[in-house]
Design a protein with these regions (language model features):
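Signature of dsDNA virion morphogenesis modules
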Residues: 1-253
């Protein structure tokens, strides 16, 4: 079992009327009369489907399977798990139009259908910071000097190139060493003499268990660490000599 971190922006419940309306439509945030004075309420995009800049790929089916591991998990500082400053109390799954998705309906679908039909999905969380116990920290969060960073465990992974997803064994059969250094490199897959995929080598996380989230200081250069989903990644210049060529036929040969 390995651990993974993913950063995103914190949105305070009080920030704007538009934010209140958008978030209130998909997740439970208390009204003024229901707020507890010793708590700072916030919401954030916890994780999104697709591939982030760490070359980790989140499938919709895996995010849905992990739904019951989100709520009641701790909020810590800089991933120091003993420094608990709050907790997550609600979650919602939304699409790219910020429409709330029914989790029971999602859970009833087969993995293939989920991965095809919900490729642009996000998990929103609502949480609280114990502001009377940590007043300085709460003020800094309110001033947007911190980001929220998702924490999760995963129990194994597959390897993805374009639309082709392979088990670790299959990836090894076609020449990919069991080495973290290959992730992020460009590869093309040849099958029966034809190119069937060409893209970055990515890690598809399996059996995810969300373990909470931390708040981390905003870096000096946010664009260098903001983790975007696959459909937002920029085009990069590629040296043809650096492309890894993989023979897909070796998988079939290895399975015979």
């Amino acid at each position: 079992v390995e651990k993974f971190y993913l950063e995103a922006d914190i949105q305070l419940e009080k920030e704007t009327d538009d934010l209140k309306k958008a978030v209130a439509a998909v997740i439970d945030l208390p009204g003024p009369e229901d707020k507890q004075p010793d708590l700072l309420y916030f919401s954030a995009i916890f994780v999104s489907t697709g591939t982030n800049l760490n070359n980790a790929h989140f499938l919709p089916s895996e995010l849905v399977k992990a739904e019951n591991t989100i709520v009641s998990k701790a909020l810590d500082v800089e991933h120091q798990e003993e420094d608990i400053i709050g907790h997550i109390y609600d979650r919602a799954y939304i699409n790219s139009s910020n429409k709330k998705l029914n989790i029971e309906e999602l859970a009833s679908k087969e993995s293939g259908s989920l991965d095809k039909d919900y490729s642009d999905m996000h998990i929103v969380i609502a949480g609280v910071i114990y502001k009377n116990r940590f007043p300085t920290l709460a003020e800094e969060v309110a001033d947007n000097t911190w980001r929220v960073s998702m924490e999760c465990y995963y129990n194994g992974y597959d390897v993805k190139v374009g639309d082709v997803i392979m088990t670790q064994r299959e990836a090894e059969l076609i020449g990919l060493a069991h080495d973290d250094k290959v992730f992020g490199k460009i590869a093309k897959i040849i099958k029966n003499g034809k190119e069937i995929a060409k893209d970055k080598i990515e890690r598809v996380l399996r059996d995810i268990c969300f373990s909470g989230c931390g708040i981390v200081k905003n870096p000096a250069n946010p664009p260098s660490v903001v983790l975007e989903t696959a459909h937002k990644k920029e085009k990069e210049s590629i040296n043809p000599k650096e492309i890894i060529v993989l023979d897909y036929d070796k998988i079939e040969q290895g399975n015979t």
